[in-house]
Amino acid sequence: MIRWILSLLIILLTWTSVTGTGLAQTQDNPPLTEEQLEEGQSIAKKAIAATENGNFAQAETYWTQLVETFPSNPAAWSNRGNARVSQNKLEAAIADFNQAIELAPEAADPYLNRGTALEAQGKYDEAIADYNRVLELNPDDAMAYNNRGNAKSGEGEWEQALTDYRKASEIAPNFAFARANAALVYYQIGKTGEAVKEMRNLVRKYPMFPDVRAALTAVLWNIGQQGEAESHWVAAVGMDNRYQDRDWVKNIRRWPPQMVAALDKFLNLK
């Protein structure tokens, strides 16, 4: 999971802190005018709107304009990296995160986002190193724990992953994806009862959460509760039909192997 800096106030404050110091003190980087700042504000609004609408290619174009106008702004670089991750432009995204980290080595978000890109490349050790750095900077970063759990899952370190997911849920009790990930791992390590209990709790609290509906379908089908499994499936695919695609579930959503196998049995009516 990546983290966007979508608060216009935060972006503008970052610009102010940069333009009021380093940029203002060199001939190569003259002070920005009020007109430039207003134009930047307008572009940032467009970038945020495009991001919220899922138009990541357009968002990338806007963030590029901001990077060119405000090259010392780490938030602009990090957000363009996120737009590129969302389009699977992973190497270009990592280059952007590297630049953001160079500009702001004590900022947590670029490390978190670079970790996500590295994880998508299967570079789990490097991703974990970035998540560890986030936790050095902010020991209570729930998303860093969740993401590190994802990377640990990628390495097959299920107990370590479960510890991270639990920690993320402890820090942020409403972090539904961390709880869902923990439930998936419960099933992976043979704790089916705990998996079902957590999935049912999540469905009650978040009835529009397709990942948990699909997971509960797979688990219930495999323990002989076909009727309830079917009802959850109708709800799940009604919200997100990608769960019908085993390859997507395995390689993009990255469910644990036992969960993928359970879903496969359901899809093939075994």
Tell me what each language-model feature is:
Residues 2-6, 13-70, 270:
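N-terminal leader/linker segments that initiate helical-solenoid repeat arrays
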